[in-house]
Amino acid sequence: CLLIESDRGLILVDTGFGTREVAMPGRRIAPFFRALNNPQLRPEETAIAQIQRLGFKPADVRHIVISHLDFDHAGGIEDFPHATIHITAREKEVADERRGGAFVGTRRYRPQQWDEAENWSLYPMGGGEPWMGFDAVRDLQGLSPEILLVPLAGHTWGHSGVAIDTGRGWLFYAADAYFYRGEIGAERYDCPPGLRGYQRMMEVDRTARLANQQRIRDLALQQQGEVRIFCAHDAREFELLSGIEKSSTGAPSVRELEFA
């Protein structure tokens, strides 16, 4: 998860598992993924608990930007009932209908994780002024202009990254567009076989996923020092990026929260 402190309140990017996954994992996570991933569901690692430890209240989270609605990214949505949820319309549509692959579609998407949420802002898959050569959605409703949605279809039909202008350069959260730093940050592609297989199992469009991964790789090489890229599931990237300090320019302050 990513927590952004802005003049418009706290903005949470993805939510990880929430308190209800901790309390009722059998109802909230498909047995297949509980067995495969063996998630360690600890109350203290939920986004709401980490935010409270930072001295904030849950109601301080005014907005949630969701990359996609997979079970491990959307579980905490209902811990923040007053927040507005920002997501592509395509992702909301396919998640509600549980269309995310012949085998995993009904398992990856758990509508009970968001069916109580009332405040949604839905966006097209791009169409705004490009960002670094990528389609982008700018002017997210109620959010600072420094925060953009960047569509990255392939892992899911409506999957997006999130770009944040910190005032000292860009952060680019690529979510599940890749899983391991060696996929984008090395001269030669490198990814552990297990993660490679997991990505293939979860993808809905291999051509789009690999094309977007290559574009992220190109961005990493071309914009070194200007854009810091990270994904949702690489622990080493988390270690390097956690605890980014507030910019002296007044741009949004960004912190990483560890996924439960």
What are these regions (language model features)?
Residues 78-81, 113-115:
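Short, conserved loop/helix-junction motifs that constitute active-site signature segments
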Residues 13, 67, 87-88, 173-176, ...:
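Active-site flanking residues adjacent to catalytic metal/cofactor-binding acidic residues
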Residues 9-63:
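Pre-active-site segment of Zn-dependent metallo-hydrolases
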Residues 37-56, 60-72, 89-151, 196, ...:
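Metallo-beta-lactamase
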Residues 19, 34-49, 168-260:
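Cap/insert and terminal regions of metallo-dependent hydrolase folds
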Residues 1-25, 56-59, 79-82, 122-185:
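Catalytic core of the metallo-beta-lactamase
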